[in-house]
Every structure is written in C-alpha cells, then in structure tokens.
Amino acid sequence: MEKVRLTAFVHGHVQGVGFRWWTTSQAQELKLAGSASNLSDGRVCVVAEGPQTQCEELLRRLKENPSSYRRPGHVDTVIEQWGEPRDVEGFVER
C-alpha cells in the first residue's frame, strides 16, 4: 500500500476547543504518524503520513460538516497538500 504525506490547513474556530486533541485521537485510530499544530493566524496545521486510504479518511473527518465524529469547534475550510512521506513516527500535538 502506497504511503503518502497529507498536510491540511484547517480554517475556522479550531483553537482552544480541543481540536488538536481530537485530531490526534483520530489519527492514532487510523494508525497515522504526524502532528497537529496551532498556527499564529488561528489555523491548525495537520500533517499525517501513512497509507493513502487512511490519510483520505482523516481528511474526510476533518472536512465533514456536521461532524459525525463529535469534532470540537467549527471547520470552515480545509486546504490540503499531498506529498512524499518523510517517515515520521507517532502522532503528536504541538
């Protein structure tokens, strides 16, 4: 199965509401590696590496409105970028 790297910039009310914690739990459930980080402009940057189907599922969960996964906050837009994996391990909040 091909591994990929997803970088998703999540816009909306996503800081100070448990969004990074929720993203980490979803990524760990999907067995993805990477991170979820607050950006100074109010966005959250999610980097995930793993099988393409699993990364696509995380992206679907990030974008879904309303969320059937009890996602905290409110997502307005998700900008995605795809690339080659860098072989990171584990998934962390930053």
Swiss-Prot record:
It holds the Pfam family Acylphosphatase. It catalyses: an acyl phosphate + H2O = a carboxylate + phosphate + H(+). Transmembrane segments: none annotated. Residues 5-94 form the Acylphosphatase-like domain. The active site is at R20, N38. It is an enzyme of class 3 (hydrolase). The keyword Protease does not apply. InterPro entries: Acylphosphatase, Acylphosphatase-like_dom, Acylphosphatase-like_dom_sf, Acylphosphatase_CS. GO terms for molecular function: acylphosphatase activity. Keywords: Hydrolase. Its EC number is 3.6.1.7. Belongs to the acylphosphatase family. This is Acylphosphatase. The lineage of its organism: Bacteria, Bacillati, Actinomycetota, Actinomycetes, Mycobacteriales. The gene is acyP.
